[in-house]
Amino acid sequence: KEEVLQREPQLNPDKLMGGGVYLDYRNNDARLVIENIKKAHENGGLMVSHVKAQHILHDENGNVNGVNVKDLLTGEEFDIHARLVINTTGPWSDFIREMDDQLEVTPQMRPTKGVHLVVDRSRLNVPQPTYFDSGQQDGRMVFAIPREGKTYFGTTDTDYQGDFLHPRVEQADVDYLLKTINDRYPEAEITIDDVEASWAGLRPLIASNGSSDYSGGNSGKITAQSFDEVIAIVDKYEKQLVSREDVEDVLNHLESTLSENKPNPSAVSRGSSLDVAQDGLITLAGGKITDYRKMAAGAI
């Protein structure tokens, strides 16, 4: 406790038991996207902007072979044909799947909204990024991050069904974060007047209840019997004693036992999903920024 307060002297000592130190990384998300686009171009990819997908195209056998698109600057519509069509549109994944008239689409996405607030570092001077429980009995963890003379803190985690292009920071988001940060740093006394900027983003989470920390039905725990059944069926599959369908049946049964209740947003898995439809449309969704290269390699 004493060492934690030496590192973070403004931290509230009440109920503080201790802390830990871990390594983390930071990145510029917009720059990361641009660098990936540049590298794809270097490797022969054709980059287009302001072009919107409208329909999924199929060949005479019903297999996906391209996309009909519209240039939003000129209004021109045209077809783009390809051997593979991969849907990597994040929160919009279900919308793209619905463009495929050969699919019966069951929604798989559960987008949640995350909000950060920004104050001047003179108002909240944290020496290094700090990660702590929100203190609001919701299972959330919150960051306070110093960067370039400012301090960011967040994030929230709430279900979102609004405009995906323009998620808004609501008063409830601000109130939640101000209460959380002032509970942990009471001497700072941060108010709405200290907030210089804010932003909201969407997490493209998978709706299925597959996370290890799921808090819904069956107390969110996989029973020992179910765990043994999964291990046994996978072992038999590796020995070629059962089919892939047998493995899927066991996993589907396990999922159904965990889906009695809808988990809260923070309990939804941050894992990824790779789906190949019968007509060949590939959808890669979910995941985290730290996994994006692994996800891409797995899809290819």
What is each model feature region?
Residues 39, 101-153, 158-300:
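C-terminal catalytic lobe of FAD-dependent flavoproteins
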Residues 50-54, 71-73:
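Conserved SAM/SAH-binding loop
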Residues 21-22, 67-71:
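Short beta-strand segments that buttress and anchor functional surface loops
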Residues 63-67, 127-128:
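Short, hydrophobic/aromatic-rich segments at coil-to-beta transitions
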Residues 73-84, 88:
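Core beta-strand elements of the Rossmann-like FAD/NAD(P) dinucleotide-binding domain
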Residues 46, 55, 81, 141-143, ...:
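Short, surface-exposed charged micro-motifs
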Residues 87-103, 297:
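Flavin (primarily FAD) binding-site architecture
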Residues 1-35, 42-44, 48, 60-62, ...:
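Flavin (FAD/FMN) cofactor-binding and adjacent substrate-gating region
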